[in-house]
């Protein structure tokens, strides 16, 4: 094969290019630049190489940071029971977009069971209404989500749901879909003023049972600390818009959980205390659990004291400088309440790509009670 042709257009001067060759036709047939067959093959190779180069560049642009993201298919999350009500709220197509999660559609339309990407069952309705799960209509491989924000002490009947659910949505940090009651977020605006304090301690409680640890602790505190009790249990209920301004007048708020369980930190801490501007005195999981969510100097844990009397003395004798130190976090952080079930369910879409499809909770009761 002759590759020394001086002209690539098929009109080379063979005698000039190769004066030592006497058979010009043989030379022409073997010249890549002159033979039309070889020219077509060469141009074909060039075109193929160019196509491969374009494909490679397109892949590279999509794979590097800042490249055009691949469009994500819209996920449909079916809510079988809307929590605590027979009617779901309005669920528009952009519901999850409001919470920063695109390509996610929530629906309470049970006719979508066959096509939904995941189905959510809230335990309270399973527990109180004895609703029948649509096991005979379940599509093969469809993930089912068990959801609750209640403590194990108030969650019953889990033995009936062995080997059914794939994922768990709850306040537990080891849940597949972790949804706390609240969190602290970075905040760069001006520090909000601390409400004026005129009273010592407040407690809002609706379900007061003497057998509960919080009731026992309150009985021990009461002789040493002035605590104003609100809620149905005391006959002094507060309207929804009255709770925060009422608690804001108090220096401390008793954030006593109704039961003490792993990661169980509810609105009694996030809303009733932190959002209201009172220092939370907490009874719940260990101090280390609270410190996973907030700075260690943002709350007072009852476990840090040997007795209720010692705790009361600490609260009553606290000077103003020490008291204001519990609000240092407000200079850079703010409370974000996560009490909207729509946002909680939208979180499923954010976690969906990372969750194992083949996982099954064979003993949901043992896992949740642990």
From Swiss-Prot:
Pfam families: Glyco_tran_10_N (PF17039), Glyco_transf_10 (PF00852). Signal peptide: none annotated. Glycans are attached at residues 86, 109, 319. Its EC number is 2.4.1.-. One of its GO terms (molecular function) is 4-galactosyl-N-acetylglucosaminide 3-alpha-L-fucosyltransferase activity. Pathway: Protein modification; protein glycosylation. Coiled coil: none annotated. It is a single-pass type II membrane protein. The chain crosses the membrane at residues 37-59. This is Alpha-(1,3)-fucosyltransferase 7. The gene is Fut7. Residues 60-370 are lumenal. Belongs to the glycosyltransferase 10 family. Expressed in lymph node and kidney. It comes from Rattus norvegicus (Rat). N-glycosylated. Disulfide bonds join 96-104, 239-242, 346-349. GO terms for biological process: CD4-positive, CD25-positive, alpha-beta regulatory T cell differentiation; ceramide metabolic process; embryo implantation; fucosylation; inflammatory response; leukocyte migration involved in immune response; leukocyte migration involved in inflammatory response; lymphocyte migration into lymph node. Inhibited by NaCl. Inhibited by GDP in a concentration dependent manner, with an IC(50) value of 93 uM. Also inhibited by GMP and GTP. Inhibited by N-ethylmaleimide. Activated by poly(ethylene glycol) by enhancing the thermal stability of FUT7. Activated by Mn2+, Ca2+, and Mg2+. Both panosialin A and B inhibit activity with IC(50) values of 4.8 and 5.3 ug/ml, respectively. Inhibited by gallic acid (GA) and (-)-epigallocatechin gallate (EGCG) in a time-dependent and irreversible manner with IC(50) values of 60 and 700 nM, respectively. Gene3D superfamilies: Glycosyl transferase family 10, C-terminal domain.
